[in-house]
Amino acid sequence: MKTKDLLFAIIPLVMAGCGLFKSADNLYKEAEIKRNGGEVQAALELLQRIVNQHTDHKKAPEAQYLIAEIYYRDMRDYSEAIKQYDKVKNNFPDSKQVPFSLFMQGFIFANMLADFKQAEIHYSKFIKKYPDHELYQSVEFELKYLGKEIKDIPALKHITS
């Protein structure tokens, strides 16, 4: 075998060993393991690889959504979470994560940032666009009691007692 042929046979094996050819599914699983182990930055990097390298894969919108969730839940970086949820809506407009992203943006604006105007905008978009969605009633509830204290919401009064 010629040296050139040998190199062409070895290079893909070396690259695969380095993780350059990992599937989107494997990267996603690895990201979940990293996140659950508290390595959120490593998880974000793996998820970003899915979004960048496997754009058309079914895991790409899930990866983008999980990036947003990590910023919201793990890092409590609400502004960045809102931006990442926007990427779900803009880059994967037909994915099932879009309504959840819109809901989460409204939720963050209302409950974390106390920006009730933006919350109302996002929740109203949800109501118009997704009248049959499983979160529809939750959005109606959020809109109805937007800006109110828990003690002022009859259905939740028992929580503060």
Task: For the regions a language model picked out, list residue spans one by one.
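Bacterial N-terminal signal peptides that target proteins for export
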Residues: 1-7
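Acidic, polar-rich low-complexity tracts and alpha-helical solenoid repeat scaffolds
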Residues: 6, 14-161
